[in-house]
Amino acid sequence: MQQSAQLITENKEFNEDFPRFLKDVGLDNVGFDYHVVAVLGSQSTGKSTLLNKLFGTQFSTMDTVRRQQTTKGIWVSRGKDSSILIMDVEGTDGRERGDDQDFERKSALFSIATSEVIIVNMWENQIGLYQGSNMTLLKTVFEVNLQLFHENIERSRLQFVIRDFLGSTSLDNLSETLMTDLNRTWASISKPEGLENSVITDFFDVDFSALPHKVLCAEAFDEETDKLREQFLDEKNPKYLFKPCYHKRIPADGFPLYTQGIWQLIQNNRDLDLPTQQQLLAQYRCDEFIAEAMVSFDEQCEELLTFLKTHQSIENLLQRLEAIQTSTFSIFDENARRYQSEVYTKKRQELDRMMKTRLAVPIQRYLAAIHKELVAGFPERIATLVKDACFKDVARVTVSEMVSVMHSEAAALQKEGFVCDAEQTVETLRVELLQLVRSMREERLAQISAKLMVQFEQEFADAIDVSFHHLTKDIWDNIMHKFDELREKVLDEMLRSLNEYIDDEMDEDAELLRTKHMFKLKRSTWLVLRRTLENETAEPILQQRLRTHFEDSFRYDSRGIPKMWKKSDILENDFNKSLQDTLQLIDVLAIVRLKDGSVPTVDVPLAEEGEDTASNLEADTFFTFLNRKKKANIHVSVKRAADLVFLDCKRSIISTATRVPGYFWALLAVLGWNEFVSVLKNPVLLTLLLIVVSFLFILVQTGLAGPVKAFAERSVRNAVNSMGEKLAEKLDDYRSTSPASETTSGRVISAENSSVDEKVSTTP
C-alpha cells in the first residue's frame, strides 16, 4: 500500500492520481468521518519529523549531514490507526527557491483553505523575528484568504508548535509575543467591505504548544509529543483539536475535486503574483546597503565596548550611541533613498531594529556592570553607615539610593529605545539588594543571638552552681526563678535587636521573621537549661555534692561551728537526721518539681521538625534527670560515705571516754595539791597560769574549745602511736643483737611486748 503521495508538485502542478491514493489508504468511503491537518514552517525545522512522530507517517526527513531540502511541493499521508489526512508542505525560506516566494504563499493559502488544523512549526529562537516566524507569509495568506473566500469562509485552528523549547522564557510569554505579532499582522492587511473591524479570532482559533529539543532532551521530547498526539486522537481530551466547526463539510470521496478547485483558484489569482521588478530591485539594493552600513556599525560597536569599560556617564553613552546610529543611517541613506520610497522606508526601519538588537548586548553589559558595582559596594556602605544609625533605616535608605541610580540609567536608555523594560532592570537590582539585606541581617542577628546565648549560659551556670552548693528542698523554685529572670532579660534584648534590624516597610513577612527568631532563642534557652542541669545532676558529681551536704549538716551546727559529741545518743540522733535530709534530696533532685508539685511549662516545641517525638526533648521527660537505677546507686553511695563519717565520730567518743577515767581526776587533785599551792605562791607560775586560764576561757566563749580539743587529742594519739612504733623497733633490734638475753628473759620481754601492744591497741 502506498504510504504517501505528492499532492502538489514542486512545479505547482496538481496530482491527478490523488483520488486513487485516497482509495488505497481507505479514506475514500468514510464520508465526513475524517480530518485534515497541514504543517507550515521554515525549511529544515523538522516539520516532517514532527508529523512522523505525531501521526506515525513515513514522510522523508532531512539529511542532517547535507541539510538538503527533502519535502518538495505538498505531500499527503494517512495517519496511523486514524482517519486523519496529513499534508506535509514544502518549507519556506529554502535556498532551493531563493527569492521565489510565489509557491510559499500559494501552498500556505492552499493549506489554510483546505485544512481544519494548521500546524505552524517554528523554533523558539525564531519568535520575535518577522521573517523567521513567517509573519510576512501569513500576512499575504490572511489577506488573500479573506478576499477569495470571505463569503463562505470556515473557521480553522492555527496550532503553533514551538520547537527546541528551553523554558528560560515561559510558554505564556512566548504565546503572548506570537499573538501580538498575529494581531498586528491581521490589523495591517486590507480587508473586504464589512470586515474592516474583524479580528483574527473571528476566523481562526489560535493555540500554542512547546516541544523540547529532540536530541538533547529526547525523553522530554517524546513525552510532550505524546501529549500533543492525544489532542489530535482522543475526543475526550479537554484540548481535543478537531472541533466540528473546523470541518469543511466535504465528503471524503469529493475531497480530491474540492482541493483541485481550490488550487486552480489560487493559481489563477493575480494577487499572489511575485512583486514587481522595481520592488525586487529596491529590496535587493537596500539589503546591500544595509550590509555595507552594518560593517561600519560593527566596527563602532567594538569601540563602544572599550568605551564602556571606562564606566562613562549615561550622557556620554547616549551621545556615543546616537553618533553610531547617525553614522550608520547616513551610510544607508546616501544611496538607498534613491530607490522606491516604500521599500526604502521599510528597510530603514529594519536597519533600525537590527542596530537596536545588536546594541542590546553592550548596553546590557553596561547595565550589568553598574548592577555589579552597586551590589559589590552595598555591604561596605551598610557597614559604614550602620555604626551611627539603625540597621533597618540605613538599609532602606541605601537600597533606595542605589535603585534610584539604576533607574536613572535604565530610564534614559529606554527613552531612546535601547532598553525595552527599564523597570525590569531596576526590579532585578532591587530584588538582589533586598536579598543582600536579608543575608546581612540574618548574619548579624545570628551573631547577636549567639552572643546572648553565651552570656545567658554563663550566668545561668553560675546560678546553678550556687544553688547546688547549698542544696535545699526548694532548689528548683530558686533555679526556675533565676532561669525566668535571665531568660526574660535575653528575650527583651533580642526583641530590641529584631526591631532594629527588621523593617516593616521592606519586609512583608516582618512579623513572621520576629516570631521565627524569638522561637529559636526561646528553644535555645530551654536546651541550655536541660544541658546545664544534666551536667550538674551527673551521677558522680551529684554523689559528691550530696556527701558534702551530709557532712556540712552533720559536722557543723547552724552557725557553721564544728560539733563535738560526748554522748552516743546525741551523735546518733544528729546522724539520722542529717542522713534522712540528705537522702530525701535524691528524690527532690530526680525531677524538676516546684513547691506546688507542678512541673514547669515549656512555652515552645522542643523537638525540631523531623525529630523523633519520643526523644528526650519531649515535655514528659525533659525535666527528669534521675531514673530509678541512678537514684539507687546514689542512695547506696551516700549511705556508705555517711556510715564512714559516723564511725569516725563514734570512735572519737569511745576513745575519749576510754583514755580519761573518772578516778584520774581525784587522784590528780590529791597528789598534785602541793604543786598547785606552790604555783599560787610563785608570781611567775601564777602569771603563767592566769594566761593559760584566760586563753582557755576565750576558747570556750568563742566556741573553739571543741576543735582545739579534738586537735590536741589527735596530736597526742598520733604521738603515742609513733612512740609505740619506735619502741617496737627498739625491741626488735634488741632481740636480734642479744639472743641469750632473749632466751633467759623471754617471759619478761613477752610481758613487755604484751603491755606495749595493749597500750597501742587502746589508742584509736
Curated annotation (Swiss-Prot):
- What broad taxonomic lineage does this protein's source fall under? Eukaryota, Fungi, Dikarya, Ascomycota, Taphrinomycotina
Q: How does it sit in the membrane?
A: Multi-pass membrane protein
Residue spans crossing the bilayer: 660-680, 684-704
Q: Please report the name of this protein according to its UniProt entry.
A: Protein sey1
Q: What is its main location?
A: endoplasmic reticulum
Q: Which keywords does this Swiss-Prot/TrEMBL entry list? A: Coiled coil, Endoplasmic reticulum, GTP-binding, Hydrolase, Membrane, Nucleotide-binding, Transmembrane, Transmembrane helix
Q: Using the record for this protein, list the coiled-coil segments as residue ranges, or answer none.
A: 302-322, 421-443
- GO MF annotation list: GTP binding; GTPase activity
**PANTHER family, from UniProt?**
PROTEIN SEY1 (PTHR45923:SF2)
